From Swiss-Prot:
The keyword Methyltransferase does not apply. Pfam families: I-set, PSI, Sema. The lineage of its organism: Eukaryota, Metazoa, Chordata, Craniata, Vertebrata. GO terms for biological process: axon guidance; negative chemotaxis; neural crest cell migration; positive regulation of cell migration; semaphorin-plexin signaling pathway. It comes from the Eukaryota. This is Semaphorin-4E. The gene is sema4e.
Length: 766
């Protein structure tokens, strides 16, 4: 029952309803620009047959990048890593590989020598360690005369380098002393944080101190410098582990930050050769939609000035598949210091015979305070080193190293759904107006790097740069402030990038709306330039707006010249359009009207598809985008197309032209009809034509007179054959036998006045 309550307690603390406040627009941020592999502008180094480029040491004094891989060490030019200065093979022997394989490890992958440790020593040499087929080995590496040389050390390397090449570890070299956090045995079941010196010192082998940890990062903070309390320097350790305070049937992992004092020598009787200053606290990065604590994956510390300004930036990922959110949180050194120096402790409390519950310790603390370094207060009591600490203080630290209060961030700097974050580095950029901004470079599990910055609580991801195939996670990031270069390692190679690629921003709008503190639009040269001291002296000719993204000063952009596109009937036509920003809303228009998707038209992220194109698809297309920044809308026309269809004659035609021809033909028909009507009226008016009704009256009168004529001369008419049908002037083949009869007939017809009308009527039929 108590176990169930413990789990419910964890879920309550991390319930989304408790964590949604204050995040605003940072939840699920989207990169403004996506840069594909072929356009990333980086330099790639890889060697045939070599893998696992995951250990780096920047040697600015030698202008070298020392790169550790699987069974090889490289010295690369720091300005151009494609230039290989030297290479050293450090391979396992056949016997070492067989011995490793006989212990149950995979001969192909596990039983190799993975370079895991690279640190510069005070004398200029480098301390290097490799897994050496599950038999860690260390040595001194030197570079001289264009060659790398290795001196193998015959020393006990347990706890200095991991046995397992795929186990998380961390290390640091501080004033010649080597600090490490890894496992001490072949099985990886003895985790330890230790300092390897003549006075070697380490953690206790107990789950109260370390419970199945994954070590992440180690950092030296010189808190002893100008410290009014006379405090000592600290070594901070970031890791994740199984939470002892949430003991249950289901394991719950949490993130931790621990610290020890640099001058710690261990105890005299209690905690002999063990840390007397080891304290740890839960590290929280609270994100909505997550039911369990996120786990820390990498940490980078940045100190703009002295140690009091140091900030730790950490990336977190979910510990289950129920959430796809990764986050970045930051922690001030003063906040961490306060938890350890003034916070309350947790103590184990036996609830049942098989269950221990950790609760806040409310009793009296020993003096000096457990876990404190030797400071002015301890010196006042006559204690000058940890060997002189009382057993009561040491026993408290041994039993209760866990703080009750967690180290928390105000709110995540960045939350993003999708590929998990893996690594982070941070640099400071000075803007055009002289203000400083912390720019983060975040590696992902999908082989890309995010460039992001926070403006007054608003997180802006300027770009996502794809460096490797999506199946290759980013495994290491290193930043050279002097070279302004980023070095990114993976299983398959290393890429060198400039921290500012302002040339990617093609227009003033694109440059200013990117809100990149490294970049500004130069009105004199009309291109996006890297901000430097020269620009700051003539800031009136450079446009940069980081907090507001105000691009109103940008010159107006003219309408783009249309691109002519022709197609055959039934083709599929694609009209490309790639907006500058993923945050912009794309707007397609056809002959000035918005386009809606249909069975024949599909709007894609990079263009417009027209299926089974016909004459109806011809016309004028435009692609524009509207980007909203700080409630301001900026519209850009990216491309225009004049689309025509090939006709059977081999010429192009558009629906617009066809309709113009149709309208012209209709107009000509109307005009011709009007002309014909006018001619008809004119002929009627002149009497050249008669109406049908008049023709019927004339014909009736003619027939009446013909009857009268037949009554006067019946015999003569009977002996004559005359055709008076309407076509008698054209189809009458009979002739009169004598002109006398013709003359008489003409005279008779003329006396009645009907014959000439008959002839007029016949003409009208023509």
């Amino acid at each position: 029952m108590m176990s169930l309550l413990a789990v419910l307690c964890v879920l309550y603390v991390w319930s989304p309803a408790m964590l949604t406040g204050g995040l605003g627009s940072t939840l699920d941020s989207l990169p403004r620009k996506t840069v594909p592999i072929g356009s990333n502008g980086g330099r790639l180094f890889r060697e045939e047959g070599i893998w696992n480029y995951t250990t780096m040491l920047l040697r600015d004094d030698l202008n070298l990048l020392i790169l550790g891989a699987r069974e090889a060490i490289f010295a690369l030019d720091l300005d151009d890593i494609t230039i290989k200065k030297a290479m050293l093979k450090w391979e396992v022997t056949r016997d070492q590989q067989n011995d490793c394989s006989n212990k149950g490890k995979d001969a192909t992958n596990d039983c190799k020598n993975y370079i895991r440790i690279l640190h510069k020593k005070n004398d200029g040499r480098m301390y290097v360690c490799g897994t050496k087929a599950f038999n860690p080995t260390c040595g001194y590496l030197s570079y001289a005369d264009g060659k790398l040389t290795l001196e193998i050390l015959q020393e006990d390397t347990k706890g200095k380098c991991p046995f397992d090449p795929f186990q998380r570890y961390t290390s640091a070299m501080v004033d010649g002393a080597y600090y490490s956090a890894t496992s001490m045995n072949f099985r990886g079941s003895e985790p330890v944080m230790m300092r390897s010196t003549e006075e070697s010192i380490r953690t206790e082998f107990t789950s109260t101190w370390l419970s199945e940890p994954n070590f992440i990062h180690m950092a030296h903070i010189p808190e002893g410098q100008s410290n009014p309390d006379g405090d000592d320097d600290k070594i901070y350790l970031f890791f994740s582990e199984t939470a002892v305070e949430y003991e249950s049937y289901t394991k719950v992992d949490v993130s931790r930050v621990a610290r020890v004092c640099k001058g710690d020598l261990g105890g005299q009787r209690t905690l002999q050769k063990k840390w007397t200053s080891f304290l740890k606290a839960r590290l929280d990065c609270q994100v909505p939609n997550t039911n369990l604590p996120l786990l820390v994956q990498d940490v980078f510390h940045l100190c703009p000035d002295d140690w009091t300004t140091c900030v730790f930036y950490a990336v977190f990922t979910p510990q289950s598949d129920s959430s796809q959110y990764s986050a970045v949180c930051s922690y001030k050194i003063e906040d961490i210091k306060t938890v350890f120096s003034k916070g309350k402790f947790k103590a184990p409390f036996n609830v049942e015979t098989s269950f221990v519950k950790w609760v806040m310790y409310s009793g009296e603390l020993p003096d000096p305070r457990p876990g404190a370094c030797i400071d002015n207060h301890a010196r006042e009591k006559g204690i000058t080193k940890s060997l002189e600490l009382p057993d009561k203080t040491l026993q408290f630290v041994k039993d209760k190293p866990l703080m009750d209060q967690a180290v928390t961030a105000e709110q995540p700097l960045l939350v993003k759904r999708g590929a998990a974050f893996t690594r982070i580095v941070v640099t400071t950029a000075t803007a055009l107006n002289g203000t400083s901004h912390q720019v983060m470079f975040i590696g992902t599990k999908s082989g890309s790097v995010l460039k992001a910055v926070n403006y007054n609580g608003e997180m802006v991801i300027m770009e996502e740069i794809q460096l490797f195939d999506p199946s290759e996670p980013i495994k290491i990031l290193r930043l050279s402030s002097s070279k302004k270069q980023l070095y990114v390692g993976s299983e398959v190679g290393v890429v060198q990038l400039s921290i500012s690629e302002c040339g990617r921003y093609q227009t003033c709008l694109d440059c200013v709306l990117a809100r990149d503190p490294h970049c500004g639009w130069d009105l004199d040269t009309e291109h996006c330039a890297t901000i430097n001291s020269i620009h700051r002296t003539r800031s009136s000719t450079v446009i940069q707006s980081l907090n507001d993204g105000d691009a109103s000063q940008c010159p107006a952009i003219g309408v783009s010249k249309p691109v002519n596109i022709s197609f055959y009937h039934g083709n599929t036509v694609k009209l490309g359009c790639q907006p500058y920003s993923n945050l912009a809303q794309v707007k397609w228009q056809f002959n000035g009207e918005p386009i809606k998707p249909s069975n024949t038209i599909q709007i894609l992220s990079d263009g417009l598809m027209i299926f089974n194109a016909s004459l109806d698809a011809t016309g004028y297309y435009t692609c524009s985008s509207i980007e909203t920044v700080s409630q301001r809308k900026y519209q850009t026309q990216h491309v225009a197309y004049d689309v025509k269809m090939w006709s059977e004659s081999g010429t192009t035609a558009s629906l617009h032209h066809v309709k113009e021809k149709e309208r012209t033909l209709v107009a000509m028909v109307v005009i011709l009809s009007l002309v014909l009507a006018a001619l008809l009226i004119w002929n009627l008016y002149k009497g050249h034509l008669s109406l049908p009704c008049l023709h019927r009256r004339v014909k009736a009168t003619q027939n009446r007179h013909e009857d009268d004529a037949n009554q006067v001369q019946p015999q003569r008419l009977a002996s004559s054959v005359v055709n008076f049908n309407s076509n008698n002037n054209h189809a009458n083949d009979q002739r009169y036998s004598s002109s006398r009869e013709t003359d008489r007939l003409s005279t008779t017809a003329g006396s009645t006045g009907q014959m000439s009308l008959k002839y007029i009527d016949d003409e009208s039929e023509i």
